[in-house]
Amino acid sequence: MSRVDPDFPQKVYDVVSKIPRGKVMTYGQIAAYCGAAWASWEVGQIAHNGPSDLPWQRVVNKRGGLAAGWPGGGRATHAELLRAEVVEVSDEYTVDVNKLLWNPSQATLL
Protein backbone atom coordinates (compact mmCIF):
# COMPACT_ATOMS: atom_id res chain seq x y z
CA MET A 1 0.00 0.00 0.00
CA SER A 2 3.01 2.24 -0.45
CA ARG A 3 1.38 4.12 -3.33
CA VAL A 4 -0.97 5.97 -0.99
CA ASP A 5 -0.20 8.35 1.83
CA PRO A 6 0.19 6.89 5.33
CA ASP A 7 -3.08 8.50 6.48
CA PHE A 8 -5.11 6.82 3.72
CA PRO A 9 -6.42 3.92 5.86
CA GLN A 10 -7.66 6.31 8.55
CA LYS A 11 -9.38 8.43 5.90
CA VAL A 12 -11.11 5.29 4.60
CA TYR A 13 -12.23 4.37 8.14
CA ASP A 14 -13.60 7.88 8.64
CA VAL A 15 -15.63 7.79 5.40
CA VAL A 16 -16.98 4.27 5.95
CA SER A 17 -18.02 5.11 9.51
CA LYS A 18 -20.35 7.79 8.14
CA ILE A 19 -22.22 5.75 5.51
CA PRO A 20 -25.85 5.75 6.70
CA ARG A 21 -27.93 2.60 7.12
CA GLY A 22 -29.68 1.72 3.89
CA LYS A 23 -27.04 3.42 1.71
CA VAL A 24 -23.87 2.16 0.02
CA MET A 25 -20.66 3.58 -1.38
CA THR A 26 -18.29 2.00 -3.89
CA TYR A 27 -14.62 1.22 -3.37
CA GLY A 28 -13.67 3.75 -6.04
CA GLN A 29 -15.96 6.40 -4.66
CA ILE A 30 -14.40 6.04 -1.20
CA ALA A 31 -10.92 6.19 -2.72
CA ALA A 32 -11.82 9.43 -4.51
CA TYR A 33 -13.23 11.01 -1.35
CA CYS A 34 -9.95 10.09 0.36
CA GLY A 35 -7.86 11.82 -2.30
CA ALA A 36 -6.70 8.81 -4.32
CA ALA A 37 -9.33 8.05 -6.98
CA TRP A 38 -7.13 5.32 -8.48
CA ALA A 39 -6.92 3.40 -5.17
CA SER A 40 -10.12 1.32 -5.18
CA TRP A 41 -8.12 -1.91 -4.78
CA GLU A 42 -6.44 -0.46 -1.71
CA VAL A 43 -9.85 0.40 -0.25
CA GLY A 44 -10.82 -3.25 -0.72
CA GLN A 45 -7.70 -4.38 1.11
CA ILE A 46 -8.38 -1.95 3.93
CA ALA A 47 -11.98 -3.20 4.13
CA HIS A 48 -10.81 -6.81 4.29
CA ASN A 49 -8.32 -6.12 7.06
CA GLY A 50 -9.86 -3.13 8.82
CA PRO A 51 -11.66 -2.76 12.14
CA SER A 52 -14.66 -5.06 12.35
CA ASP A 53 -16.81 -2.46 14.10
CA LEU A 54 -17.18 -0.37 10.92
CA PRO A 55 -20.14 -0.88 8.53
CA TRP A 56 -18.08 -2.52 5.74
CA GLN A 57 -21.27 -4.19 4.46
CA ARG A 58 -22.20 -0.79 3.01
CA VAL A 59 -19.23 -0.90 0.62
CA VAL A 60 -19.83 -2.52 -2.78
CA ASN A 61 -18.19 -2.58 -6.19
CA LYS A 62 -19.07 -0.05 -8.89
CA ARG A 63 -21.77 -2.34 -10.30
CA GLY A 64 -23.31 -2.92 -6.87
CA GLY A 65 -21.69 -6.33 -6.50
CA LEU A 66 -21.09 -7.78 -3.07
CA ALA A 67 -17.71 -9.05 -1.87
CA ALA A 68 -16.95 -12.68 -2.70
CA GLY A 69 -14.27 -12.68 -0.02
CA TRP A 70 -16.49 -11.42 2.78
CA PRO A 71 -15.27 -12.96 6.05
CA GLY A 72 -17.38 -15.82 7.36
CA GLY A 73 -19.36 -16.68 4.26
CA GLY A 74 -18.63 -14.54 1.23
CA ARG A 75 -21.44 -12.87 -0.67
CA ALA A 76 -24.18 -14.65 1.28
CA THR A 77 -22.96 -13.16 4.57
CA HIS A 78 -22.51 -9.73 2.96
CA ALA A 79 -26.09 -9.95 1.64
CA GLU A 80 -27.43 -11.01 5.04
CA LEU A 81 -25.88 -7.96 6.72
CA LEU A 82 -27.33 -5.60 4.11
CA ARG A 83 -30.76 -7.23 4.25
CA ALA A 84 -30.73 -6.71 8.02
CA GLU A 85 -30.59 -2.99 7.16
CA VAL A 86 -33.58 -3.46 4.82
CA VAL A 87 -31.41 -3.17 1.70
CA GLU A 88 -32.75 -5.17 -1.23
CA VAL A 89 -30.12 -7.59 -2.56
CA SER A 90 -30.73 -9.49 -5.80
CA ASP A 91 -30.30 -13.24 -6.22
CA GLU A 92 -27.06 -12.39 -8.07
CA TYR A 93 -25.78 -10.65 -4.93
CA THR A 94 -26.00 -7.10 -6.23
CA VAL A 95 -27.67 -3.94 -5.00
CA ASP A 96 -29.12 -1.09 -7.05
CA VAL A 97 -26.34 1.50 -6.82
CA ASN A 98 -28.44 4.02 -8.75
CA LYS A 99 -30.98 3.92 -5.93
CA LEU A 100 -28.75 3.36 -2.89
CA LEU A 101 -25.52 5.23 -3.62
CA TRP A 102 -24.62 7.78 -0.97
CA ASN A 103 -23.01 10.91 -2.40
CA PRO A 104 -22.15 13.10 0.58
CA SER A 105 -20.60 16.52 0.27
CA GLN A 106 -16.98 16.82 1.35
CA ALA A 107 -18.25 18.99 4.23
CA THR A 108 -20.38 16.07 5.47
CA LEU A 109 -17.28 13.91 5.66
CA LEU A 110 -15.18 16.41 7.61
Task: Report residues per predicted region.
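Nucleic acid-binding interface residues in structured DNA/RNA-binding domains
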Residues: M1-L110
